[in-house]
Amino acid sequence: MSVNIKTLNAFIATVILAVGILSCKDDSGNNIPEANYEVTIENVSESYPILKSDVFAVPVGATDPAPIGPGGAYEFEFTAPEGSRLSLATMFVQSNDWIYSFGEDGIALYNEDGTKVTGDVTSQLDLYDVGTEEDQEPGTGSNQAPRQSGTDTGSVDDNENVRLVDDMELPSNDEVISVTLTSTSKYGFKVRIENVSTSNTLQTSEGGKPVPLSPGVWLVHPASQNALLFTVGAPDYGEGLEAIAEDGMPDELAGNLSDKTGLTVPLSPGTFAIYEGMNPLFQEGESSSANGLEKLAEDGIIDMLVSFLSSESNVSARGGFAKPVGAGQAGPLLPGDQYKFTFTARQGDKLTFATMYVQSNDLFYSPVEDGVPLFSGSEPISGDITDQVRLWDAGTEENEEPGVGGNQPLRQTEPDTGPEDPNTNVRLVNDQYNYGNTSDRIKITIQQVMN
Protein backbone atom coordinates (compact mmCIF):
# COMPACT_ATOMS: atom_id res chain seq x y z
CA MET A 1 0.00 0.00 0.00
CA SER A 2 1.60 3.26 -1.09
CA VAL A 3 1.13 6.41 0.97
CA ASN A 4 -1.27 8.98 -0.49
CA ILE A 5 0.62 12.24 -1.10
CA LYS A 6 -2.31 14.49 -0.12
CA THR A 7 -2.81 12.82 3.23
CA LEU A 8 0.93 12.63 3.77
CA ASN A 9 1.24 16.38 3.25
CA ALA A 10 -1.56 16.91 5.74
CA PHE A 11 0.35 14.80 8.22
CA ILE A 12 3.54 16.76 7.61
CA ALA A 13 1.63 19.93 8.45
CA THR A 14 1.13 18.65 12.00
CA VAL A 15 4.84 18.10 12.51
CA ILE A 16 7.17 20.72 13.94
CA LEU A 17 10.57 21.47 12.47
CA ALA A 18 13.58 19.61 13.82
CA VAL A 19 14.29 20.43 17.45
CA GLY A 20 17.93 21.02 18.32
CA ILE A 21 19.75 19.07 20.96
CA LEU A 22 19.66 20.61 24.39
CA SER A 23 22.27 19.72 26.99
CA CYS A 24 22.74 20.43 30.65
CA LYS A 25 25.77 18.22 31.13
CA ASP A 26 28.40 19.41 33.60
CA ASP A 27 31.47 17.24 33.85
CA SER A 28 32.79 19.30 36.79
CA GLY A 29 36.29 18.08 36.06
CA ASN A 30 35.44 14.45 36.81
CA ASN A 31 37.41 11.87 34.85
CA ILE A 32 34.32 9.89 33.88
CA PRO A 33 34.53 8.26 30.41
CA GLU A 34 32.64 10.34 27.88
CA ALA A 35 31.86 9.88 24.17
CA ASN A 36 30.11 11.55 21.28
CA TYR A 37 27.52 9.45 19.47
CA GLU A 38 25.51 9.46 16.27
CA VAL A 39 22.28 7.47 16.09
CA THR A 40 20.66 6.49 12.79
CA ILE A 41 16.99 5.54 12.66
CA GLU A 42 16.15 3.88 9.35
CA ASN A 43 12.76 2.86 8.01
CA VAL A 44 13.53 -0.57 6.56
CA SER A 45 9.96 -1.53 5.70
CA GLU A 46 8.77 -2.07 2.15
CA SER A 47 6.57 0.26 0.13
CA TYR A 48 3.60 -1.62 -1.31
CA PRO A 49 1.17 -0.59 -4.08
CA ILE A 50 -1.50 -3.05 -2.88
CA LEU A 51 -3.02 -3.21 0.59
CA LYS A 52 -4.72 -6.61 0.34
CA SER A 53 -5.07 -9.33 -2.30
CA ASP A 54 -6.16 -12.94 -2.60
CA VAL A 55 -7.93 -15.47 -4.80
CA PHE A 56 -11.59 -16.43 -4.99
CA ALA A 57 -11.77 -20.05 -6.04
CA VAL A 58 -14.17 -22.11 -3.90
CA PRO A 59 -17.84 -21.68 -4.84
CA VAL A 60 -20.32 -20.92 -2.07
CA GLY A 61 -21.42 -24.22 -0.55
CA ALA A 62 -18.47 -26.16 -1.99
CA THR A 63 -15.22 -27.30 -0.40
CA ASP A 64 -12.87 -27.33 -3.39
CA PRO A 65 -11.88 -24.79 -6.05
CA ALA A 66 -14.00 -24.90 -9.21
CA PRO A 67 -15.59 -22.70 -11.86
CA ILE A 68 -19.14 -21.52 -11.20
CA GLY A 69 -21.98 -22.30 -13.57
CA PRO A 70 -25.50 -20.83 -13.65
CA GLY A 71 -26.66 -20.05 -10.11
CA GLY A 72 -23.20 -20.51 -8.61
CA ALA A 73 -21.36 -17.81 -6.69
CA TYR A 74 -18.04 -16.84 -5.14
CA GLU A 75 -17.85 -14.70 -2.01
CA PHE A 76 -14.95 -13.05 -0.24
CA GLU A 77 -14.54 -10.47 2.52
CA PHE A 78 -12.01 -7.81 3.47
CA THR A 79 -11.58 -4.54 5.32
CA ALA A 80 -10.47 -1.38 3.55
CA PRO A 81 -9.84 2.25 4.50
CA GLU A 82 -11.63 5.20 2.98
CA GLY A 83 -10.15 6.05 -0.41
CA SER A 84 -9.59 2.41 -1.39
CA ARG A 85 -10.50 0.77 -4.67
CA LEU A 86 -11.28 -2.83 -5.61
CA SER A 87 -9.96 -4.63 -8.69
CA LEU A 88 -10.63 -8.20 -9.78
CA ALA A 89 -10.43 -10.60 -12.71
CA THR A 90 -12.44 -13.72 -13.59
CA MET A 91 -12.48 -15.64 -16.88
CA PHE A 92 -15.35 -15.69 -19.37
CA VAL A 93 -14.79 -19.44 -19.68
CA GLN A 94 -16.39 -19.84 -23.13
CA SER A 95 -13.55 -17.82 -24.65
CA ASN A 96 -9.88 -18.08 -25.49
CA ASP A 97 -8.58 -15.24 -23.30
CA TRP A 98 -11.36 -12.97 -22.02
CA ILE A 99 -11.88 -11.68 -18.49
CA TYR A 100 -14.42 -9.64 -16.61
CA SER A 101 -12.74 -6.80 -14.73
CA PHE A 102 -13.38 -3.35 -13.29
CA GLY A 103 -10.72 -1.95 -15.60
CA GLU A 104 -7.34 -0.39 -14.94
CA ASP A 105 -8.50 1.77 -12.02
CA GLY A 106 -10.81 -0.65 -10.21
CA ILE A 107 -13.93 0.70 -8.52
CA ALA A 108 -14.23 3.05 -5.55
CA LEU A 109 -15.26 1.41 -2.28
CA TYR A 110 -16.32 4.72 -0.73
CA ASN A 111 -18.40 7.60 -2.02
CA GLU A 112 -17.09 11.16 -2.01
CA ASP A 113 -18.97 11.86 1.23
CA GLY A 114 -17.16 9.00 2.96
CA THR A 115 -20.07 6.55 2.95
CA LYS A 116 -19.47 3.03 1.70
CA VAL A 117 -20.42 1.84 -1.76
CA THR A 118 -22.88 -1.03 -1.45
CA GLY A 119 -25.28 -2.86 -3.73
CA ASP A 120 -25.01 -3.98 -7.34
CA VAL A 121 -21.83 -2.77 -9.07
CA THR A 122 -22.11 -5.00 -12.15
CA SER A 123 -22.52 -1.97 -14.41
CA GLN A 124 -18.90 -1.05 -13.70
CA LEU A 125 -17.62 -4.34 -15.12
CA ASP A 126 -16.28 -4.69 -18.64
CA LEU A 127 -15.24 -7.67 -20.72
CA TYR A 128 -11.59 -7.54 -21.82
CA ASP A 129 -9.58 -9.49 -24.38
CA VAL A 130 -6.15 -10.02 -22.80
CA GLY A 131 -4.51 -10.43 -26.22
CA THR A 132 -2.60 -13.62 -25.51
CA GLU A 133 -4.50 -16.11 -27.69
CA GLU A 134 -6.27 -15.94 -31.04
CA ASP A 135 -10.03 -15.73 -30.64
CA GLN A 136 -12.40 -18.44 -31.79
CA GLU A 137 -16.19 -18.35 -31.82
CA PRO A 138 -17.23 -18.10 -28.15
CA GLY A 139 -18.60 -21.38 -26.85
CA THR A 140 -17.32 -23.53 -29.71
CA GLY A 141 -13.55 -23.11 -30.02
CA SER A 142 -11.35 -26.16 -29.58
CA ASN A 143 -8.76 -24.10 -27.71
CA GLN A 144 -11.22 -22.78 -25.15
CA ALA A 145 -11.12 -24.14 -21.61
CA PRO A 146 -14.17 -26.46 -21.74
CA ARG A 147 -12.92 -28.16 -24.93
CA GLN A 148 -9.12 -27.81 -25.10
CA SER A 149 -6.81 -30.80 -24.74
CA GLY A 150 -4.64 -29.06 -22.15
CA THR A 151 -3.78 -25.69 -20.69
CA ASP A 152 -2.20 -22.93 -22.75
CA THR A 153 -3.21 -24.23 -26.17
CA GLY A 154 -4.12 -22.10 -29.16
CA SER A 155 -2.37 -19.73 -31.53
CA VAL A 156 -0.87 -16.43 -30.47
CA ASP A 157 -3.13 -13.42 -30.97
CA ASP A 158 -2.07 -11.11 -33.82
CA ASN A 159 -3.05 -8.19 -31.58
CA GLU A 160 -1.22 -8.70 -28.29
CA ASN A 161 -2.68 -5.64 -26.56
CA VAL A 162 -5.29 -5.80 -23.80
CA ARG A 163 -8.53 -4.32 -25.13
CA LEU A 164 -12.28 -4.28 -24.69
CA VAL A 165 -14.06 -7.17 -26.38
CA ASP A 166 -15.88 -5.89 -29.46
CA ASP A 167 -18.52 -8.49 -30.30
CA MET A 168 -22.11 -7.31 -30.64
CA GLU A 169 -23.42 -10.90 -30.64
CA LEU A 170 -22.40 -11.53 -27.05
CA PRO A 171 -24.85 -11.40 -24.13
CA SER A 172 -24.70 -8.25 -22.03
CA ASN A 173 -22.52 -8.41 -18.95
CA ASP A 174 -25.49 -8.43 -16.59
CA GLU A 175 -26.87 -11.51 -18.38
CA VAL A 176 -23.76 -13.44 -17.34
CA ILE A 177 -22.41 -12.01 -14.10
CA SER A 178 -23.59 -10.08 -11.05
CA VAL A 179 -21.25 -8.42 -8.57
CA THR A 180 -22.61 -6.96 -5.34
CA LEU A 181 -20.98 -5.26 -2.34
CA THR A 182 -22.33 -5.62 1.21
CA SER A 183 -21.14 -3.80 4.32
CA THR A 184 -20.10 -6.18 7.10
CA SER A 185 -18.64 -3.71 9.62
CA LYS A 186 -17.39 -0.12 9.82
CA TYR A 187 -14.60 -0.86 7.36
CA GLY A 188 -15.68 -4.35 6.25
CA PHE A 189 -17.01 -5.49 2.87
CA LYS A 190 -18.34 -8.72 1.41
CA VAL A 191 -18.20 -9.24 -2.34
CA ARG A 192 -20.49 -11.71 -4.09
CA ILE A 193 -19.78 -12.74 -7.67
CA GLU A 194 -22.74 -14.67 -9.04
CA ASN A 195 -23.17 -16.47 -12.34
CA VAL A 196 -26.58 -15.35 -13.62
CA SER A 197 -26.33 -17.01 -17.02
CA THR A 198 -28.66 -19.81 -18.10
CA SER A 199 -28.18 -22.84 -20.30
CA ASN A 200 -29.04 -20.69 -23.34
CA THR A 201 -27.43 -17.33 -22.52
CA LEU A 202 -24.61 -17.64 -25.07
CA GLN A 203 -26.01 -18.14 -28.56
CA THR A 204 -23.54 -20.02 -30.77
CA SER A 205 -23.54 -21.80 -34.12
CA GLU A 206 -24.05 -24.97 -32.08
CA GLY A 207 -26.99 -23.60 -30.11
CA GLY A 208 -27.46 -21.96 -26.73
CA LYS A 209 -24.91 -22.51 -23.96
CA PRO A 210 -24.19 -21.32 -20.40
CA VAL A 211 -21.18 -19.14 -19.54
CA PRO A 212 -19.14 -20.51 -16.64
CA LEU A 213 -16.94 -18.10 -14.67
CA SER A 214 -13.52 -19.09 -13.36
CA PRO A 215 -11.66 -18.68 -10.09
CA GLY A 216 -9.89 -15.34 -10.07
CA VAL A 217 -8.05 -12.71 -8.07
CA TRP A 218 -9.07 -9.61 -6.15
CA LEU A 219 -7.04 -6.73 -4.74
CA VAL A 220 -7.64 -3.64 -2.62
CA HIS A 221 -5.44 -0.66 -3.41
CA PRO A 222 -5.33 3.12 -3.02
CA ALA A 223 -6.72 5.30 -5.79
CA SER A 224 -3.18 6.48 -6.53
CA GLN A 225 -2.24 2.98 -7.68
CA ASN A 226 -3.84 1.82 -10.91
CA ALA A 227 -3.14 -0.50 -13.85
CA LEU A 228 -2.11 -3.19 -11.38
CA LEU A 229 -3.63 -6.01 -13.44
CA PHE A 230 -3.24 -4.65 -16.96
CA THR A 231 -2.98 -1.55 -19.12
CA VAL A 232 -5.48 -1.14 -21.92
CA GLY A 233 -3.64 -0.79 -25.23
CA ALA A 234 -0.51 -2.55 -23.95
CA PRO A 235 0.52 -6.22 -23.82
CA ASP A 236 -0.17 -8.42 -20.81
CA TYR A 237 2.45 -7.96 -18.07
CA GLY A 238 3.39 -11.64 -18.06
CA GLU A 239 2.64 -12.00 -14.34
CA GLY A 240 -0.13 -14.59 -14.56
CA LEU A 241 -3.19 -12.81 -15.95
CA GLU A 242 -2.83 -14.95 -19.08
CA ALA A 243 -3.33 -18.10 -17.00
CA ILE A 244 -6.65 -16.74 -15.71
CA ALA A 245 -7.80 -15.43 -19.09
CA GLU A 246 -6.97 -18.64 -20.98
CA ASP A 247 -7.39 -21.37 -18.38
CA GLY A 248 -9.09 -19.94 -15.29
CA MET A 249 -5.99 -20.57 -13.17
CA PRO A 250 -5.32 -17.75 -10.65
CA ASP A 251 -2.39 -19.04 -8.60
CA GLU A 252 0.49 -17.53 -10.61
CA LEU A 253 -1.03 -14.06 -10.65
CA ALA A 254 -2.06 -14.33 -7.01
CA GLY A 255 1.53 -15.14 -6.07
CA ASN A 256 2.90 -12.14 -7.95
CA LEU A 257 0.28 -9.85 -6.45
CA SER A 258 1.11 -11.17 -3.00
CA ASP A 259 4.70 -9.97 -3.45
CA LYS A 260 3.31 -6.45 -4.00
CA THR A 261 0.82 -6.60 -1.13
CA GLY A 262 1.31 -5.24 2.34
CA LEU A 263 1.14 -2.24 4.63
CA THR A 264 3.44 0.70 3.96
CA VAL A 265 4.41 2.11 7.37
CA PRO A 266 5.93 5.59 7.72
CA LEU A 267 7.59 6.52 11.00
CA SER A 268 7.06 9.90 12.61
CA PRO A 269 9.45 12.56 13.84
CA GLY A 270 10.45 11.70 17.38
CA THR A 271 12.30 12.59 20.54
CA PHE A 272 15.30 11.20 22.38
CA ALA A 273 16.73 11.56 25.87
CA ILE A 274 20.06 10.75 27.51
CA TYR A 275 19.44 10.02 31.16
CA GLU A 276 20.37 8.24 34.35
CA GLY A 277 17.97 6.32 36.55
CA MET A 278 14.29 6.07 35.58
CA ASN A 279 13.10 6.27 31.98
CA PRO A 280 11.73 9.81 31.54
CA LEU A 281 9.38 8.91 28.67
CA PHE A 282 7.18 6.26 30.28
CA GLN A 283 6.88 3.44 32.77
CA GLU A 284 5.41 0.15 31.60
CA GLY A 285 2.07 -0.57 33.26
CA GLU A 286 1.44 3.05 34.15
CA SER A 287 -0.60 5.71 32.40
CA SER A 288 1.39 8.05 30.20
CA SER A 289 1.10 11.35 32.02
CA ALA A 290 0.53 14.66 30.29
CA ASN A 291 4.18 14.81 29.24
CA GLY A 292 3.52 14.88 25.50
CA LEU A 293 3.90 11.17 24.76
CA GLU A 294 0.24 11.06 23.73
CA LYS A 295 0.79 13.72 21.07
CA LEU A 296 3.76 11.82 19.67
CA ALA A 297 2.07 8.40 19.79
CA GLU A 298 -1.21 9.59 18.23
CA ASP A 299 -0.10 12.32 15.82
CA GLY A 300 3.70 12.37 15.56
CA ILE A 301 3.88 15.81 17.21
CA ILE A 302 7.02 16.13 19.34
CA ASP A 303 7.36 19.68 20.70
CA MET A 304 5.49 19.09 23.97
CA LEU A 305 7.52 15.99 24.82
CA VAL A 306 10.85 17.70 24.06
CA SER A 307 9.81 20.60 26.28
CA PHE A 308 8.88 18.22 29.09
CA LEU A 309 12.27 16.49 28.91
CA SER A 310 13.96 19.85 29.46
CA SER A 311 12.49 19.93 32.96
CA GLU A 312 13.62 16.45 33.98
CA SER A 313 16.60 16.56 36.35
CA ASN A 314 17.90 13.10 35.38
CA VAL A 315 18.06 14.01 31.68
CA SER A 316 21.43 15.36 30.55
CA ALA A 317 20.60 15.77 26.85
CA ARG A 318 17.45 15.68 24.85
CA GLY A 319 16.16 16.70 21.45
CA GLY A 320 13.99 15.95 18.47
CA PHE A 321 14.59 14.36 15.10
CA ALA A 322 12.23 15.52 12.40
CA LYS A 323 14.00 16.02 9.07
CA PRO A 324 14.89 12.89 7.05
CA VAL A 325 18.46 12.80 5.79
CA GLY A 326 18.64 14.68 2.50
CA ALA A 327 15.17 16.21 2.86
CA GLY A 328 14.47 19.91 2.69
CA GLN A 329 11.86 19.95 5.42
CA ALA A 330 10.58 18.06 8.42
CA GLY A 331 8.31 15.12 7.73
CA PRO A 332 7.57 11.43 8.27
CA LEU A 333 10.20 8.80 7.58
CA LEU A 334 9.22 6.79 4.51
CA PRO A 335 10.65 3.36 3.61
CA GLY A 336 14.35 3.62 2.82
CA ASP A 337 14.82 6.99 4.56
CA GLN A 338 16.75 7.86 7.71
CA TYR A 339 16.74 10.23 10.66
CA LYS A 340 20.04 11.00 12.41
CA PHE A 341 20.85 12.75 15.67
CA THR A 342 23.97 13.24 17.78
CA PHE A 343 24.70 13.73 21.46
CA THR A 344 27.38 13.44 24.11
CA ALA A 345 27.08 10.94 26.95
CA ARG A 346 29.22 9.55 29.73
CA GLN A 347 29.53 6.27 31.55
CA GLY A 348 26.27 5.43 33.32
CA ASP A 349 24.06 7.23 30.81
CA LYS A 350 21.30 5.50 28.88
CA LEU A 351 19.46 6.28 25.65
CA THR A 352 15.74 6.26 25.04
CA PHE A 353 13.72 7.60 22.13
CA ALA A 354 10.25 7.37 20.61
CA THR A 355 8.91 7.48 17.05
CA MET A 356 5.31 6.79 16.02
CA TYR A 357 4.15 3.80 13.99
CA VAL A 358 2.13 6.11 11.75
CA GLN A 359 -0.38 3.50 10.51
CA SER A 360 -1.75 3.17 14.05
CA ASN A 361 -3.78 5.05 16.62
CA ASP A 362 -1.19 5.41 19.39
CA LEU A 363 1.71 3.02 18.90
CA PHE A 364 5.37 3.95 19.02
CA TYR A 365 8.78 2.35 18.74
CA SER A 366 11.03 2.83 21.75
CA PRO A 367 13.75 0.84 23.53
CA VAL A 368 12.95 -1.48 26.40
CA GLU A 369 11.81 0.36 29.51
CA ASP A 370 15.30 0.35 31.05
CA GLY A 371 16.72 2.11 27.98
CA VAL A 372 19.97 1.37 26.14
CA PRO A 373 23.17 1.60 28.24
CA LEU A 374 25.64 3.69 26.26
CA PHE A 375 28.78 2.15 27.74
CA SER A 376 29.88 -1.43 28.20
CA GLY A 377 32.14 -1.05 31.17
CA SER A 378 34.19 1.99 30.25
CA GLU A 379 33.86 1.46 26.48
CA PRO A 380 31.27 3.27 24.31
CA ILE A 381 28.83 0.92 22.60
CA SER A 382 28.58 0.74 18.81
CA GLY A 383 26.55 -1.14 16.23
CA ASP A 384 23.00 -2.32 15.60
CA ILE A 385 20.76 -1.98 18.66
CA THR A 386 17.44 -2.82 16.97
CA ASP A 387 17.06 -5.91 19.15
CA GLN A 388 16.53 -3.59 22.12
CA VAL A 389 13.60 -1.79 20.45
CA ARG A 390 9.95 -2.69 21.05
CA LEU A 391 6.55 -1.59 19.72
CA TRP A 392 4.61 0.06 22.54
CA ASP A 393 0.96 1.02 22.97
CA ALA A 394 0.61 4.42 24.66
CA GLY A 395 -2.85 3.50 26.00
CA THR A 396 -4.36 6.82 24.96
CA GLU A 397 -6.57 5.81 22.03
CA GLU A 398 -8.47 2.67 21.11
CA ASN A 399 -6.65 0.60 18.50
CA GLU A 400 -8.04 0.11 15.01
CA GLU A 401 -6.72 -2.17 12.29
CA PRO A 402 -3.37 -0.73 11.14
CA GLY A 403 -3.61 1.04 7.81
CA VAL A 404 -7.42 0.92 7.86
CA GLY A 405 -8.66 2.89 10.87
CA GLY A 406 -10.17 6.28 10.20
CA ASN A 407 -8.70 7.75 13.41
CA GLN A 408 -5.10 7.15 12.32
CA PRO A 409 -2.98 10.12 11.12
CA LEU A 410 -3.14 9.49 7.38
CA ARG A 411 -6.95 9.25 7.47
CA GLN A 412 -8.19 11.26 10.46
CA THR A 413 -9.90 14.62 9.96
CA GLU A 414 -7.74 16.34 12.57
CA PRO A 415 -5.24 15.47 15.32
CA ASP A 416 -6.38 13.82 18.55
CA THR A 417 -9.44 12.04 17.19
CA GLY A 418 -10.69 8.60 18.17
CA PRO A 419 -12.21 7.06 21.30
CA GLU A 420 -10.11 6.61 24.43
CA ASP A 421 -8.46 3.27 25.13
CA PRO A 422 -10.18 1.46 28.02
CA ASN A 423 -6.69 0.33 29.10
CA THR A 424 -4.81 3.57 29.75
CA ASN A 425 -1.48 1.96 30.68
CA VAL A 426 1.61 2.03 28.48
CA ARG A 427 2.28 -1.55 27.45
CA LEU A 428 3.82 -3.74 24.80
CA VAL A 429 1.41 -4.13 21.91
CA ASN A 430 -0.82 -7.15 22.40
CA ASP A 431 -4.00 -7.13 20.33
CA GLN A 432 -5.56 -8.99 17.41
CA TYR A 433 -3.76 -7.08 14.68
CA ASN A 434 -0.54 -7.79 12.77
CA TYR A 435 2.01 -4.99 12.87
CA GLY A 436 4.94 -6.88 11.36
CA ASN A 437 8.24 -7.72 13.02
CA THR A 438 10.04 -4.75 14.55
CA SER A 439 13.23 -5.61 12.65
CA ASP A 440 11.26 -5.52 9.38
CA ARG A 441 10.08 -1.96 10.10
CA ILE A 442 12.91 -0.10 11.81
CA LYS A 443 16.68 -0.35 12.19
CA ILE A 444 18.64 1.55 14.85
CA THR A 445 22.41 1.88 14.72
CA ILE A 446 24.72 3.83 17.00
CA GLN A 447 28.34 4.77 16.50
CA GLN A 448 30.94 6.84 18.25
CA VAL A 449 31.95 10.01 16.42
CA MET A 450 34.93 12.26 16.96
CA ASN A 451 34.74 16.01 17.43
Segments predicted by a language model, with ranges:
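Mature, soluble, non-transmembrane domains
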Residues: 71-184, 326-451
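Structured domain cores in non-transmembrane regions
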Residues: 31-116, 186-188, 197-369
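Bacterial N-terminal signal peptides that target proteins for export
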Residues: 2-12
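Short, ordered beta-strand-loop transition motifs
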Residues: 11-12, 183-186
